[in-house]
Amino acid sequence: MLIKALITNLVIVICEVLTLGHIRGKRNILKYYTYLQNFLALIVSLVFSVCSIVYLVSGRIIPEYIRGLRYVATCGLLATMFTFIVFLGAGKKIVITEDDFLFGFSPVMANIILHYICPILSLVSFLLFEREIKISNGIWTAIVAIPSCIYWITYMVLSLTNAWEEPYNFASKANKIWDVLSVLLIPLSFIVISYTLWNVK
């Protein structure tokens, strides 16, 4: 199973490098939740792949924290998929355009890779192929929320103080009250995703 996990994580690395590598303004990686979570997933899958190769060659045990990082990355990717489907998909507020990528790379392909392919691959690998790597320390249920909490707190502070041009318009005064309140579904969904994934791991 570990070989399947290795292959799946290498595919994730290739998909992430291909997509994030074609972003025109690399500083935008710090602006969008999708880019940040996928960049984190890229790093984690790369680390996982290296550790898996070392394990397969030397027989060393893969430490628990490696699967803990995979848990964090998988929850983050699933949260981006949920956010995209609920708030940004179906022609609602898709902000990734051709201007965001180098010539010849389709934003449609970027959306498919970042919001569907990588999250699903990560989920399949975590639940099916990585089970032999035990994870039991409950601290990961707290660590998993750190990247998202940092992003969304920073996002709301910068948006409400008009310190940047808000990428998603979630906090815009032009939005209806319901639209703003509905953003609360994002942390709620993250709690549900992380809780469910932890209990079926």
What residue ranges belong to the model's regions?
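Juxtamembrane "helix-exit" motif on the non-cytosolic side of transmembrane helices
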Residues: 18-27, 87-99, 128-131, 157-165
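Interfacial segments of alpha-helical transmembrane regions
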Residues: 59-78, 134-145
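Alpha-helical transmembrane segments in multipass membrane proteins, preferentially the mid-helix core
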Residues: 117-135
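Membrane-interface loop-to-helix entry segments
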Residues: 108-120, 180
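Short, contiguous, well-structured surface segments enriched in hydrophobic/aromatic residues
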Residues: 41-52, 70-91
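Membrane-interface transmembrane-helix boundary segments in multi-pass integral membrane proteins
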Residues: 32, 160-201
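Loop-to-helix transition at the N-terminal end of transmembrane alpha-helices
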Residues: 29-43
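Alpha-helical transmembrane segments
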Residues: 1-16, 75, 144-150
